């Protein structure tokens, strides 16, 4: 049985770069790397068949439906994956890997597409909270016969710590924006407003690493304008990423909700101090006695 891992088909950006490395997509890329390590010989679904150093890429049409399990991180198009592989009548095997909270999407068509995928194919969620969202969507958005056949489970993925570097305190305290996107859920404006207030009182630097699409946004331009800000693209290699994390003093989390807080866990392991909103998702991310939770932006400024 071949394991085929599919991710990144929804935004049109490349999945693998010219050097044969997976393009950084935060938690999604890390999950793909984990799966490739867990299942030697697994392939990555791409737009063309290619051989890379350490793994192989194949198109959906070149996979044998009878001998392949597709683990789909793009759950919203699982039905389309099935239809592509079912053209000759074979019954393909699919597993939804819901690594983002479903609330990442907003349009009713997206919810309907996801719910149909949840009902038709088994779904593994990253964290109990995400599994709860998936279960509730299935209950609300689909008919009873389909809802009853949904198979939903969850796992706490954890993080890799084999690349962790020794923490180094920078000369100027550096605060990390702990995300690669500037979506409304991440509330980058709140982050930037807090940083402006901190920078008016203390000598501080801000570091932001964004996906290619987010780098071209108006919000990214605003974040890069202060002289104490450094805004750039994602690192090409995981080693570079961990070396940079080791030099972070702190990070400020401003998200409304998260699936399992992948970026926050990595930053904490690397030695950065995390300042979190006093929200249920954040409380579940760290130990019970963790001290740095803010209820207002004034408190966030004070803690930083």
Question: What kind of feature is each model-predicted range?
Answer:
Residues 107-150:
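A short, active-site helix/loop in glycosyltransferases that binds the activated sugar's phosphate group
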Residues 6, 165-186, 192-199, 207:
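Conserved donor-binding/catalytic core segment of Leloir-type glycosyltransferases
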Residues 101, 129-130, 147-165:
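Short beta-strand->alpha-helix junction loop in the catalytic core
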Residues 217-238:
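Nucleotide-activated donor-binding/catalytic signature segment of Leloir-type glycosyltransferases, i.e.
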Residues 204-219, 234:
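Glycosyltransferase donor-sugar binding loop
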Residues 288-299:
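Conserved acidic donor-binding segment of nucleotide-sugar-dependent glycosyltransferases
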Residues 68-75, 83-105, 122-125:
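Active-site proximal beta-strand in glycosyltransferases
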């Amino acid at each position: 049985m071949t394991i085929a891992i599919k991710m990144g088909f929804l935004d049109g950006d490349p999945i693998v770069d010219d050097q044969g490395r997976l393009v950084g997509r935060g938690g999604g890329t890390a999950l793909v790397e984990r799966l490739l390590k867990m299942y030697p010989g697994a392939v990555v679904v791409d737009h063309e068949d290619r051989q890379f150093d350490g793994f192989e890429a194949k198109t959906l049409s070149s996979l044998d439906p009878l001998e392949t399990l597709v683990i789909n991180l793009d759950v919203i198009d699982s039905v389309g994956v099935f239809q592509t592989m079912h053209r000759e009548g074979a019954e393909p095997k699919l597993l939804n890997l819901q690594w983002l909270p479903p609330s990442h999407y907003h349009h009713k068509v997206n919810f309907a597409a996801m719910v149909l995928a949840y009902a038709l194919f088994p779904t593994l969620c990253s964290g109990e909270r995400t599994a709860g969202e998936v279960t509730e969507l299935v209950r609300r958005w689909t008919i009873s016969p389909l809802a009853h056949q949904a198979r939903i489970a969850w796992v706490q993925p954890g993080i890799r710590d084999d690349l962790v570097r020794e923490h180094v305190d920078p000369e100027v305290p550096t605060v990390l924006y702990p995300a690669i996107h500037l979506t409304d859920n991440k509330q980058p404006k709140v982050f930037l407003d807090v940083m402006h207030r901190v920078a008016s009182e203390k000598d501080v630097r801000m570091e932001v690493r964004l996906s290619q699409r987010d780098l071209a946004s108006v919000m990214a331009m605003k974040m890069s304008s202060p002289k104490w800000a450094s805004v750039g693209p994602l690192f090409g290699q995981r080693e570079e990423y961990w070396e940079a994390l080791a030099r972070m003093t702190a990070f400020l989390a401003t998200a409304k909700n998260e699936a399992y807080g992948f970026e926050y866990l990595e930053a904490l392991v690397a030695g950065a101090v995390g300042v979190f909103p006093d929200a249920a998702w954040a409380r579940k991310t760290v130990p019970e006695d963790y001290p740095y939770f803010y209820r207002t932006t004034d408190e966030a400024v004070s803690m930083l």
